């Protein structure tokens, strides 16, 4: 078995890693698993910085931490003042993507001019990232973002970043990768800028896929149509490696979460409010390679992160939804349940007050025209669609394929390839936000291994 999560000793010959805009540490975890030492980081969100500090530093007996601070207010000199400048550094990070993403732009546009100005400011956080990276003359730089960054108000952000880095003595490229190609049970497409100082090497190597789409899954191309002109006109874009036909199939939702505890098998049972660190026994021993990888460092037969949302009105709807169903299907089910209850109680539409009360109790209020994809029941035999930070508000977008509920925190973590010993000791909303924003560790590890080859000239 390819033990991706086996304990990897830190290679002291490799540069140390500084993690900017770290979130809960998914990108840094991938580098740590590839043998890099995570020296420190910075993150604005307090819950996320605490989770990163615990999992990447403290639990291993280190005194390092991920600072909770605003990178726009803390100078690079202050941030680096406790580092030995003799040590070579890799600077990694993902400046917040809401300014670039279609979902984020639409949301902020609806909130008025003040938030649009905030959006503009967030769109330039890559400049703070570069300031921090160049301040220490980093040997290697890796920046993650959403593909929409190729056209932010007519500006190709990854091309702009590469221009700056090349003028500062780096070899730089950008590429777009699908996390599913690297063993993540999710078709998450993200953009990466990869750079190395020219006196050290060149970007000859980019991540090699470990998995391929299986026949029943339509490939979510990393070169989506709307990006073609930006790709064609870019000096720095590098085509991702194509998965070999001999590779294992993409990891599916069923592969990913099938051994996790049963939490709510019957829709009318009593809801249980699990605490973040409350442990529950696995449903079964690990059934496949992915499950073994997730559990490899978990020394007990129990797992944390079993919280899921108490959406009492909707449990009966979830129960009747089929795998792959969306909100239109859910609304039709709800209306059927409403008609059944009307017959049972003798209420008709003429009883307007009683009818309205009953409908509000059973039928979700969302438009079937605007919110068709607001609800989606996951399919066991396919990878998940992209997890997003909106999970912190609700989990309708990712409903459990076999149980009548939204996914749990641990199930979301599995779909992002966080191992079971990576702990989210925070509120449910905070955990979902961190997981939805994170770089999947397995994808991050593939990037780290490619950068290691670039540093070492192809010899690992």
UniProtKB/Swiss-Prot annotation:
<comment type="similarity">
    <text>Belongs to the class I-like SAM-binding methyltransferase superfamily. C5-methyltransferase family.</text>
</comment>
<keyword id="KW-0680">Restriction system</keyword>
<keyword id="KW-0489">Methyltransferase</keyword>
<dbReference type="InterPro" id="IPR050390">
    <property type="entry name" value="C5-Methyltransferase"/>
</dbReference>
<dbReference type="Pfam" id="PF00145">
    <property type="entry name" value="DNA_methylase"/>
</dbReference>
<dbReference type="InterPro" id="IPR029063">
    <property type="entry name" value="SAM-dependent_MTases_sf"/>
</dbReference>
<feature type="domain" description="SAM-dependent MTase C5-type">
    <location>
        <begin position="15"/>
        <end position="458"/>
    </location>
</feature>
<keyword id="KW-0949">S-adenosyl-L-methionine</keyword>
<dbReference type="GO" id="GO:0009307">
    <property type="term" value="P:DNA restriction-modification system"/>
</dbReference>
<feature type="active site">
    <location>
        <position position="97"/>
    </location>
</feature>
<dbReference type="GO" id="GO:0003677">
    <property type="term" value="F:DNA binding"/>
</dbReference>
<dbReference type="InterPro" id="IPR001525">
    <property type="entry name" value="C5_MeTfrase"/>
</dbReference>
<dbReference type="GO" id="GO:0044027">
    <property type="term" value="P:negative regulation of gene expression via chromosomal CpG island methylation"/>
</dbReference>
<dbReference type="GO" id="GO:0032259">
    <property type="term" value="P:methylation"/>
</dbReference>
<comment type="function">
    <text>A methylase, recognizes the double-stranded sequence 5'-ACCGGT-3', methylates C-? on both strands. No endonuclease has been identified for this methylase.</text>
</comment>
<keyword id="KW-0808">Transferase</keyword>
<dbReference type="InterPro" id="IPR031303">
    <property type="entry name" value="C5_meth_CS"/>
</dbReference>
<keyword id="KW-0238">DNA-binding</keyword>
<dbReference type="GO" id="GO:0003886">
    <property type="term" value="F:DNA (cytosine-5-)-methyltransferase activity"/>
</dbReference>
<protein>
    <recommendedName>
        <fullName>Putative type II methyltransferase M.OihORF3336P</fullName>
        <ecNumber>2.1.1.37</ecNumber>
    </recommendedName>
</protein>
């Amino acid at each position: 078995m390819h033990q991706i999560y086996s304990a990897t000793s830190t290679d002291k010959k490799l540069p140390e890693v500084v993690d900017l805009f770290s979130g809960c540490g998914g990108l840094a975890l991938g580098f740590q698993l590839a043998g890099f030492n995570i020296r420190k980081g910075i993150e604005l969100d307090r819950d996320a910085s605490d989770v990163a500090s615990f999992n990447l530093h403290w639990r291993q007996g280190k005194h390092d931490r991920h600072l909770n601070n605003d990178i726009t207010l803390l100078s690079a000199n202050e941030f680096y003042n406790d580092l030995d400048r003799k040590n070579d550094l890799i600077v990694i990070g993902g400046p917040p993507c809401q300014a670039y993403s279609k979902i984020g732009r639409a949301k902020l546009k609806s909130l008025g001019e003040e938030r649009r100005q905030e959006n503009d400011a967030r769109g330039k956080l890559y400049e703070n990232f570069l300031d921090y990276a160049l301040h220490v003359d980093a040997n290697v730089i890796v920046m993650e973002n959403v593909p929409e960054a190729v056209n932010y108000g007519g500006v190709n952000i990854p091309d702009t970043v590469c221009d700056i880095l090349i003028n500062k003595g780096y070899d730089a490229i950008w590429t777009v990768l699908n996390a599913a190609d690297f063993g993540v049970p999710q078709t998450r497409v993200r953009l990466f800028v990869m750079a190395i100082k020219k006196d050290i090497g060149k970007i000859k190597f980019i991540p090699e896929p470990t998995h391929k789409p299986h026949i029943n899954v339509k490939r979510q191309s990393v070169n989506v149509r709307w990006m073609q002109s930006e790709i064609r006109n870019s000096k720095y874009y590098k085509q991702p490696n194509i998965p070999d036909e001999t590779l294992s199939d993409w990891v599916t939702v069923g592969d990913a979460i099938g051994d996790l505890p049963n939490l709510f098998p019957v829709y009318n049972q009593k809801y249980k409010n699990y605490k973040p660190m409350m442990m529950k026994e696995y449903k079964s021993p690990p059934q496949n390679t992915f499950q073994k990888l997730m559990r490899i460092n978990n020394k007990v037969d129990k797992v944390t992160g079993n919280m899921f949302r108490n959406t009492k009105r909707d449990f009966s709807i979830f129960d009747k939804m089929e795998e792959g169903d969306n909100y239109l299907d859910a609304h039709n089910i709800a209306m059927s349940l409403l008609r059944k209850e009307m017959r049972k109680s003798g209420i008709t539409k003429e009883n307007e007050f009683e009818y309205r009360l009953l409908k509000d109790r059973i039928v979700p209020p969302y438009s079937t025209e605007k919110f068709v994809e607001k609800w989606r029941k996951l399919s066991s035999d396919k990878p998940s669609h992209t997890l997003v930070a909106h999970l912190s508000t609700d989990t309708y977008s990712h409903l459990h394929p076999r149980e009548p509920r939204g996914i749990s925190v641990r199930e979301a973590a599995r779909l992002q390839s966080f191992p079971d010993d990576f702990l989210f000791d925070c509120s449910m909303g905070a955990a979902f936000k961190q997981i939805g924003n994170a770089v999947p560790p397995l994808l991050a590890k593939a990037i780290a291994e490619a950068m290691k080859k670039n540093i070492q000239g192809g010899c690992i």
